[in-house]
């Protein structure tokens, strides 16, 4: 499985690219403009690519004018295009599906961007995708560490209070109670 249409990063997974998608033409348009799209949508998508570049994102966009049977081919197209650009993020849009590829962003970020990119309007979809990529992520690791430290501190505090309560109960029971027990027995 080698050749110009198969990326070398995942050689054991077959790609599914619809027969009606001319990957040679798509790759040539992306190389020339950064966008492969029908002429009506190209100017708006070029603006999005420029905005992404201003945000520090090397974005390539492929727009299909029809839907494939499912979204898998879009990710495969993005992977094939992305194989030529090691630092680029590739977004592939169809009327109802979205696919993406990037070596710069984690899959969870790409999936979040894809979720916001299913608008039916390619320019708005691409803008939403760029916005999601440029939005800082919530620091989940820091929150997890703070919560773990808080739970540990609460557990240690509860144990110390338990030991202090047991110690004070033992000392108050032993001192006054020792003489009373002897007097009651006589």
From Swiss-Prot:
InterPro entries (UniProt xref): Rv1476-like
Transmembrane feature ranges: 138-158
Glycoprotein found in the keyword field: no
Source taxon at top rank: Bacteria
Pfam families with a match to the protein in the record: Rv1476
Major localization listed first in the record, in broad terms: membrane
GO cellular component, as recorded: plasma membrane
Record flagged with keyword Transmembrane helix: yes
Function (record text): May affect the expression of genes linked to host macrophage apoptosis and immune response, thereby promoting the survival of M.tuberculosis in host macrophages. Overexpression of the gene increases susceptibility of the bacteria to various stresses, but promotes intracellular survival in host macrophages. It has no impact on the growth rate in vitro. Overexpression causes changes in the transcriptome of THP-1 cells, including expression of genes involved in cell proliferation, fatty acid degradation, cytokine-cytokine receptor interaction and immune response pathways.
Protein name as it appears in the record: Membrane protein Rv1476
Lineage: Bacteria, Bacillati, Actinomycetota, Actinomycetes, Mycobacteriales
């Amino acid at each position: 499985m080698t050749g110009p249409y198969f990326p070398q990063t995942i050689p054991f997974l077959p790609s599914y690219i619809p027969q009606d998608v001319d990957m040679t033409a798509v790759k040539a348009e992306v190389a020339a403009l950064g966008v492969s799209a029908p002429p009506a949508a190209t100017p708006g998508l070029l603006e999005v690519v420029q905005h992404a570049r201003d945000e520090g994102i090397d974005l390539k966009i492929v727009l299909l004018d029809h839907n494939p049977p499912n979204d898998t081919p879009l990710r495969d197209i993005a992977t094939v295009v992305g194989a030529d650009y090691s630092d680029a993020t590739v977004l592939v849009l169809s009327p109802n599906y979205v696919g993406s590829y990037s070596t710069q962003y984690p899959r969870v970020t790409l999936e979040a961007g894809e979720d916001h990119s299913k608008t039916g309007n390619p320019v708005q979809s691409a803008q939403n995708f760029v916005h999601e990529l440029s939005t800082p992520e919530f620091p989940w690791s820091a929150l997890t560490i703070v919560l773990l430290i808080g739970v540990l501190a609460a557990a240690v505090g509860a144990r110390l209070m338990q030991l202090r309560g047991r110690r004070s109960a033992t000392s108050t029971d032993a001192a006054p109670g020792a003489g009373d027990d002897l007097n009651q027995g006589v």
